[in-house]
Amino acid sequence: DDNKNLEEVVITGSYIKGAGTDEATPVDVLDSDYIQKQGALSIGELTQKLAVSSGTENNPDSFTAGGTQGTSNVNLRGLGLTSTLVLVNGKRQTIAGAVANDGSVFVDTATIPMAALERVEILKEGATATYGSDAVAGVVNFILRDDFEGLEVSVGHQKVESSDQTTDDVSVLAGFAVGDNTNVILSASFLQQDPMSSAERSYTTINAASTLGRSFLNLGGLAPGLPVVIRGTGIY
């Protein structure tokens, strides 16, 4: 029963009880009205429009996205995909099977149903003291609709100017109550986007390459699209 001097123990973790006004944190909240006005068809398109997010890999084609084709992620302040913590309803998510071009792992936000999204909360400062090292750049919390009852169908159509590329999307959201404290929500979506050739835009035509490994549209430093005369056997 003798008194003993113990070393100080510091405990760090989530769900720490305390007043919400203990410290000011810069949190941006994107509500449903803001999300709808953006006209984004997916979570990837929505996060690409965020000024605080840079360096994301959300391109749908394999030429620019590599192994991350069809996925999307969040990169706050360009500090790296592993430095942004992604939550859904305040819960951590599993890491995607795909790996980014720089070898980073990430949470695939493309698995989050756009139709069921209620709001997005973005903590733009580091929160390592609360969440750990994966929140160095900040935290993005996707909040889903949890009290929806009924059926909601959304149909969209977009067309690129001066091109035949079109994008069609259909999303369905259904919800019903089970008892007094439980809601079940089902969401499904379909997205089809036609391809657009790089030759349809002047700023990408210069980079158009043939299957032989170099561009036939810009040989000899000529303007893109102008014909050239190939002499000799130096070009194959």
Show which residues each predicted segment covers:
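Periplasm-facing N-terminal accessory domains of Gram-negative outer-membrane beta-barrel systems
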Residues: 1-8
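N-terminal periplasmic "start-of-domain" segments of outer-membrane beta-barrel proteins
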Residues: 9-38, 44, 96-101, 151
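Short loop/turn motifs at secondary-structure junctions and domain boundaries
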Residues: 21, 75-78
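Surface-exposed loop and edge beta-strand positions of immunoglobulin-like domains
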Residues: 33-36, 77, 110
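Surface-exposed beta-strand-turn/loop segments characteristic
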Residues: 45-51, 55-67, 71, 79, ...
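Short aromatic-centered micro-motifs
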Residues: 86
